[in-house]
Amino acid sequence: MMAAKRTANRRRRQVIDPRIRAEVIAKWGDRCWLRLPGCTGAGEEDDHIVPWSHRGVDSVANIRRACKHCNAMRQDRVLSGYGATIHCVIGPPTADLIGYAADYMRYDSVMVAHSEFARVLSCDDDELAGKKAVRLAAALAWDAAYRQLARTQTPLDVWLIRTLPRSRSHPDMLAEWIAFDYDIHVVDPGAEQVFDTVDNAADEQVARQWYAMGVTQASVCARLAQRHAQLVQLGLRNGTTAHDDSLEW
């Protein structure tokens, strides 16, 4: 019974009035709006900006075209501000990412940090927190928290704290964050200070991976500006300032 209901729901989401689809293509174009890593660019499917899970409707304002790859990869994540407003703080080991975020967080902000998950799991035992099993559990907790908060319709203020913006399942997480127009902060005290400060081989390896990525605040801002301009053209952002716009239906 439940399987049949899920199948019916999938069919319902895929059925769009051809007249609405024609209007969407005429107004917003027939190219993929998501631009996630691996995007083909083709407008192959109808995608709800506000998903069905958020009670999104079949309307020209709420539908854009998407390629099959991006539509599947999206997994009901929404643009920053269409549910939670998401900020990301990234940087090499020893950079004070949490301290940086704390200066900007609101009293009711939500923070997702691997180190905090590890601290809670180990009951503040630093040696235990460094164990592989605990670190893996913390990583899984981070991933689960991100998946939930990226899809929520609750207007939360969320701060994602992470060293490397990538994982096995999301090898180009940074590009995904840019596609969803997250507010991204790069905190990097510089390679010399980082390598002088790291005190173990694991952190040194992560630091080398970080600098091999070549991530800088300037490069991230340039990519975000380009993405924001695309979203303005698609009618999904207003004005010229990223992250704080809201769509009027």
Per-segment meaning from a language model:
Residues 98-157:
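Conserved substrate/cofactor phosphate-moiety recognition/catalytic segment
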Residues 1-34, 53-57, 80-82:
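Short, charged surface segments at domain edges that flank catalytic/cofactor-binding sites
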Residues 71-85:
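Extreme N-terminal, non-catalytic leader segments
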Residues 85-105:
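Glycine-rich phosphate-binding P-loop
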Residues 82-87, 154-156:
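Pre-Walker A (Motif I) flank of P-loop NTPase domains
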Residues 34-65, 74, 78:
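Histidine-centered nuclease catalytic patch
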